[in-house]
């Protein structure tokens, strides 16, 4: 069985599921009606409080457990019955393009776990799985693959994947990667959230959550006072300006380039990017699951090329 998982610092995506990269661990069930997994005699529940940024997600077990949630949600979606007979899984994952060479082997082994059988309970159902193969792909390019039919018409374009803690930038020529520009800028929207929350607390003694900031950026109804809203908009514009300057220093001028934006951060910031009028030709990949679906397309292409089943 093929299962594709996009591990974001802000959220986990499969082709069919989306949830925050946050976990609570306990010795027993919490008593609240929420998704849970029991594995290795511990109970894990999902929370909207995301995990602090990890450049290397193999540092501890949390992203492994989040992957068990992703696998379980895909099994449930596909109506796979609970079973104690191991389900063999080929797991497709991704990494920021600039980190790929350094981290991909460790990342793959983290999930492979010597192909051991893993038994767990998910929301009262019992599953047994064995991750028999792990294949990793570059994020951003995977998202671009889902739009290859459109992108191949552009002689040069830049895919910009704005995530929780990284912004990945990849140059494309007729839809194919040009390794002359491969950047991972470690300043995604989580750093924006943290900066806004810190300054708002210092100036106005108000504690903000990510969702409070999202409401203002998206121009949604909010209970926040005007000065806080203005602070959020100003700091978000400064965040985008700093990023555009970062790109310009690396030879990418957003005022003259075709820029294809992907990722949840891009969808959050879309209105401000468009209203800012600094990006001449913005194209937005609106599917937040694009990377996960792109991993599947890349895998299918490899299988077809190798004549495998």
Q: Language model features by range: what are they?
A:
Residues 162-168:
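Ser/Thr-glycine-rich phosphate-binding loops at phosphate-binding pockets of nucleotides
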Residues 200-203:
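Acidic, metal/cofactor-coordinating or nucleic-acid-engaging core segments within structured domains
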Residues 169-174:
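PRPP/pyrophosphate-binding module of the type I phosphoribosyltransferase fold
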Residues 1-157, 176-191, 211-309:
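Nucleotide/phosphate-binding catalytic cleft detector across ATP-hydrolyzing
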